[in-house]
Amino acid sequence: MIREERLLKVILAPHISEKSTVVAEKTNTVVFRVAIDATKAEIKAAVAKLFEVEVDSVRTLVNKGKTKRTGGRVGRRSDWKKAYVTLAAGADIDFVGGAE
């Protein structure tokens, strides 16, 4: 069993983009930014507990941070992890909450 404290730290934010909106409409999939060390099992448990929905599958990827320049210095943005969470048929997550 995964501790509740850990589940609250797994999901960082929903990832809203043009691609994630299209995927959500077509395949009932929601996209989240998650902790870089989060596993698929932790992500599945966190979404199921926090949003009270049934999760069908989880796919993850790590986006590598881009190299950026500020003045003469070269820096690098942090790597971050993204999770595509497919919900069971009939399940839905409402991020807006009551807005019509």
From Swiss-Prot:
Official protein name in the record: Large ribosomal subunit protein uL23
Primary gene name: rplW
InterPro entries noted in UniProt: Nucleotide-bd_a/b_plait_sf (IPR012677), Ribosomal_uL23-like (IPR013025), Ribosomal_uL23/eL15/eS24_sf (IPR012678), Ribosomal_uL23_CS (IPR001014)
Function: One of the early assembly proteins it binds 23S rRNA. One of the proteins that surrounds the polypeptide exit tunnel on the outside of the ribosome. Forms the main docking site for trigger factor binding to the ribosome.
Protein keywords: Ribonucleoprotein, Ribosomal protein, RNA-binding, rRNA-binding
A UniProt-annotated Pfam family: Ribosomal_L23
A cellular-component GO term for this protein: ribosome
Any one GO MF annotation of this record: rRNA binding
Assembly mode: Part of the 50S ribosomal subunit. Contacts protein L29, and trigger factor when it is bound to the ribosome.
Gene source species: Shewanella denitrificans (strain OS217 / ATCC BAA-1090 / DSM 15013)
Family: Belongs to the universal ribosomal protein uL23 family.
NCBIfam families linked: PRK05738.1-1, PRK05738.1-3, PRK05738.2-4
Record-level GO BP terms: translation
